[in-house]
């Protein structure tokens, strides 16, 4: 079941004229984020480099929610370009500009142009945990195995 919530968004001056983030299909989980680079100054990511790409947006999520900034699969598959800190987290109390940290893992330079869809933003509920110190933890079949311990 899909839950609908409302969130206020503000376009910063360098984001004016760009479309707001939008879902691209009826059941899409993420809204596409657009690059708010200057029209006459595209951003070129050389292979192996990264940059913080502006979106020209600020967002006010309701308490109990976060937004996750995730890669677009097409950029990764076709160009080797992805979100470096995926998923990036936008907390409900953050009011700064949404930025997308893109990295080029490909072998060719990648040009980010104004209005290009560069990432997707998924809004999700957040559970907050109250940590308590324990002398021991309940044992499990897996135990402390990690980093590939469950097989290929």
UniProtKB/Swiss-Prot annotation:
Question: Which terms are listed as keywords in the entry?
Answer: Hydrolase, Magnesium, Metal-binding, Nucleotide metabolism
Q: Which CDD domains match?
A: trimeric_dUTPase
* A Pfam family it matches: dUTPase
Q: What's an example Gene Ontology biological process for this entry?
A: dUMP biosynthetic process
- Gene Ontology MF terms in the entry: dUTP diphosphatase activity; magnesium ion binding
* Source organism superkingdom: Bacteria
Give the UniProt family note. Answer: Belongs to the dUTPase family.
Protein name per Swiss-Prot or TrEMBL: Deoxyuridine 5'-triphosphate nucleotidohydrolase
Q: What would be the name of the gene that encodes this protein?
A: dut
């Amino acid at each position: 079941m899909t839950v609908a919530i409302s969130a206020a968004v503000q376009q910063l001056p360098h984001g004016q004229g760009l479309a707001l983030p939008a879902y691209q299909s009826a059941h899409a989980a993420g809204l596409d984020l657009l690059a708010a680079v200057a029209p006459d100054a595209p951003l070129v990511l050389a292979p192996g480099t990264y940059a913080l790409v502006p979106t020209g947006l600020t967002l006010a999520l309701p308490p109990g929610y976060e937004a996750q900034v995730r890669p677009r699969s097409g950029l990764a598959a076709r160009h080797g370009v992805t979100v470096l800190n995926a998923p990036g987290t936008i907390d409900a109390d953050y009011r700064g500009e949404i930025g997308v940290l893109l990295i080029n893992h490909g072998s060719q330079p990648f040009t980010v142009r104004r209005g290009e869809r560069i990432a997707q933003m998924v809004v999700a509920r957040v559970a907050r945990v109250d940590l308590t110190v324990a002398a021991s933890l309940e044992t499990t079949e897996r135990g402390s195995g990690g980093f590939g311990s469950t097989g290929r």
